[in-house]
Amino acid sequence: MSGLIAYCRQGFEPELAAELRDRAVLLGIAGDIHAQRNHGFVLLRCDPLHVDTLLQQLHWRRLIFARQTLRLHAELKTLNSRDRIAPILAALPKTPCFGDLWIEYPDSDMGKPLAGLARSFGNALRPVLRSAGRLSAQLHPQWPRLHVCFLSGDHVLLGSTRSVDSAPWQLGIPRLKLLPEAPSRSALKLEEALITLLTSNEREAKLRPGMRATDLGAAPGGWTWVLIRQHLRVTSIDNAVLRPSLLNHPLVQHVRADGFRWTPPRPMDWMVCDMVEQPRRVAERMAVWLREGWCRHMIFNLKLPMKKRWDETRLCLERFETQAVVPLTLRAKQLYHDREEITVYASNNAR
């Protein structure tokens, strides 16, 4: 068996399946896609000769609805609860030796009850793998990492990935803590966007103290709060009121205005937007900001409809890129802290 395992948000398996299918077709690769709603993952089975290409081109950062992508090695069903280890050892590829082991389960109603089993099984499997020469004694991030994903007590997927090519969090979920002083939970969305959509080098270069940013539809101020923690000067646009702690902050200027109509008096380094509005309207307005040179970098959310979400996502991003005109770096992801939405990062490469 060969192919890809991709984790996703529960309920978005059809969107991920459609995205994988469309992108595989563009690569000229045929594959069999298995997806069941609310299971939290999708399988793409294909010819072994095509797996490396898929892993390179369908990198987790490039896929919108995937939290993690793995090389699929085996699917084991009807495992005996008294000895799950022997069949797993037998099903592993002869090479390589793995540098780390993650025991996982889908982030779904079906998968979450397996968390306890995953913890205990990892403690049992790890020493056996080391004794068999299949797992390094010490962590080796540069070696492939073995993933054992429990779908039930007797049903397991075996996969692997290289650390440099994968999401650095188990289940593809960054564990962020909402601080008491955060104005709203939406702060977690922007925090996750910054660590998911930008590399560490990009964050260092593009989020420098003293830079200027605009937060459209800012109230109550969750995204503004994240930006000032990066020491950016923020103009917060909203007719509603910000939290008092932000109103009195020296890095914050609150302007009572409609976020869709307001224009900056001078170019900004950043613009962020988490307004509840039709996704096509948001995409078009965001394109104006780049086309007019009002900002260089932006992060915004697109609230998706209940149906045809992949089609709407593709349409909005194509419309945004076309109308922005300028050469772009464009990345989008459905984040763990998103709901029925995706988060988009765009940067003007001409400036």
UniProtKB/Swiss-Prot annotation:
Its main location: cytoplasm. Keywords: Cytoplasm, Methyltransferase, rRNA processing, S-adenosyl-L-methionine, Transferase. It is found in: Cytoplasm. The active site is at K303. GO terms for molecular function: S-adenosylmethionine-dependent methyltransferase activity. SUPFAM superfamilies: S-adenosyl-L-methionine-dependent methyltransferases. It holds the Pfam family RLMM_N. S-adenosyl-L-methionine binds at S186, A219, P220, G221, G222, D238, D258, D274. Its EC number is 2.1.1.186. Coiled coil: none annotated. InterPro entries: RlmM_FDX, RlmM_THUMP-like, RNA_MeTrfase_FtsJ_dom, rRNA_MeTrfase_M, SAM-dependent_MTases_sf. Monomer. HAMAP family: 23SrRNA_methyltr_M. Catalyzes the 2'-O-methylation at nucleotide C2498 in 23S rRNA. This is Ribosomal RNA large subunit methyltransferase M. It comes from Xylella fastidiosa (strain 9a5c). The gene is rlmM.
